[in-house]
UniProtKB/Swiss-Prot annotation:
Ligand binding (Ni(2+)): 2
A molecular function (GO) term: zinc ion binding
Species the sequence originates in: Methylacidiphilum infernorum (isolate V4)
InterPro entries: Hydgase_Ni_incorp_HypA/HybF_CS, HypA/HybF
Pfam families given in the database record: HypA
Superkingdom of this protein's organism: Bacteria
Family membership: Belongs to the HypA/HybF family.
Membrane spanning residue stretches: none
Positions bound to Zn(2+): 73, 76, 89, 92
Record keywords: Metal-binding, Nickel, Zinc
Protein name stated in the entry: Hydrogenase maturation factor HypA
Function description: Involved in the maturation of [NiFe] hydrogenases. Required for nickel insertion into the metal center of the hydrogenase.
Amino acid sequence: MHELSLCESLVSLLEEEMQKLGCGALKKVVLQVGPLALIEEGAMRFAFEVASKGTVVEGAELFIEWIAVRGYCLDCQKEALVYKIGESCPCCGGVMILSEEGKDLKVASIEVE
């Protein structure tokens, strides 16, 4: 479960930012995640809760926005946007091959008190 190590790094990063900003508590974190980051949403939420326990990040809501990447269908040979690995082609239901992009995992925004 690499989500835990990702969340431990995320919490450290957020703590540093909170200290720089001089804020007391974090209310909300919005992550943007590409399909090739291989993140399982439930595991990420659980890991965030565990990693943030006892920190200024504890209790913050985690929002995950899935970033679409361009995929190519092997069957109908059309391009389409794909949000998750394993999605079928929206045109024909065929197998989609993802581009090299989509490995992103970034903090899009935070909300503080």
